[in-house]
Amino acid sequence: MSAEEKNIVRVFRAWKTAHQLVHDRGYGVSQAELDLTLDQFKAMHCGMGRNLDRTTLSFYAKPSNDSNKGTIYIEFAKEPSVGIKEMRTFVHTLGDHNHKTGILIYANSMTPSAAKIIATVTGQFTIETFQESDLIVNITHHELVPKHILLSPDEKKELLDRYKLRETQLPRIQLADPVARYLGLKRGEVVKIVRRSETSGRYNSYRICA
């Protein structure tokens, strides 16, 4: 397998995980996109010379139910390393198309200066970044990772009221936790974690993002 072929397979896996991530966050993704094969991916995103065209990998999705979430836009950076210029272009794309959330996926690295731009647009929209290697395997599909379900604000309130808890009494899940990043958790949000049990079938626990 050539170096370019290996790169195509790598990006294909990250592209698939990105679609699964968007779907799992509650945005509309077609079953055809989720089931796309490598050959179909090549036909769509590789030119006549069979080289990957990264400009065709971007996509956006609308929320399935909660319209207040706005649209989410995913872009695969054209350059291996993301600098100020590419990050600014990404920010402008989000603004021009009124996307509320943007995810920029890069191959190698992102400069500190590019990362600083993200903080300057907080409040306008949410920007997340992933390295391709983070998405080659969908961590939530691993058999040892229990199912995480984001609670709505009403469900969170009901949980706290039912058990007479304060937020500070809940166990924490860190923002940097791989599953928290996959789900796009924000501080103060609560996830229900469903684990299997040999005795009771399954049991639930809860964690708050901190």
From Swiss-Prot:
Its BP terms in the Gene Ontology are:
transcription by RNA polymerase I; transcription by RNA polymerase II; transcription by RNA polymerase III; transcription elongation by RNA polymerase I; transcription initiation at RNA polymerase II promoter; tRNA transcription by RNA polymerase III
InterPro entries registered for this protein in UniProt:
Arch_Rpo5/euc_Rpb5, RNA_pol_Rpb5_N, RNA_pol_Rpb5_N_sf, RNA_pol_subH/Rpb5_C, RNA_pol_subH/Rpb5_CS, RPB5-like_sf
Q: Which domain of life is it from?
A: Eukaryota
- What keywords are annotated for this sequence in UniProt? DNA-directed RNA polymerase, Nucleus, Phosphoprotein, Transcription
Question: Which sequence positions carry the modification called Phosphoserine?
Answer: S152
Keyword Repressor assigned? no
Pfam family of the protein (one)? RNA_pol_Rpb5_C
GO molecular function, a single term: DNA-directed RNA polymerase activity
Phosphoprotein: present as a keyword of the record? yes
Q: Where in the cell is it found?
A: Nucleus
Entry's Gene Ontology cellular component terms:
cytosol; nucleus; RNA polymerase I complex; RNA polymerase II, core complex; RNA polymerase II, holoenzyme; RNA polymerase III complex
- NCBIfam families in the record: PRK09570.1 (NF007129)
Give the family this protein belongs to, as stated in its UniProt record: Belongs to the archaeal Rpo5/eukaryotic RPB5 RNA polymerase subunit family.
Stated role = DNA-dependent RNA polymerase catalyzes the transcription of DNA into RNA using the four ribonucleoside triphosphates as substrates. Common component of RNA polymerases I, II and III which synthesize ribosomal RNA precursors, mRNA precursors and many functional non-coding RNAs, and small RNAs, such as 5S rRNA and tRNAs, respectively. Pol II is the central component of the basal RNA polymerase II transcription machinery. Pols are composed of mobile elements that move relative to each other.
Subunit relationships: Component of the RNA polymerase I (Pol I), RNA polymerase II (Pol II) and RNA polymerase III (Pol III) complexes consisting of at least 14, 12 and 17 subunits, respectively.
Question: What protein is this chain from?
Answer: DNA-directed RNA polymerases I, II, and III subunit RPABC1
At the highest ranks, the source species' classification is: Eukaryota, Fungi, Dikarya, Ascomycota, Taphrinomycotina
Q: Which gene encodes it?
A: rpb5
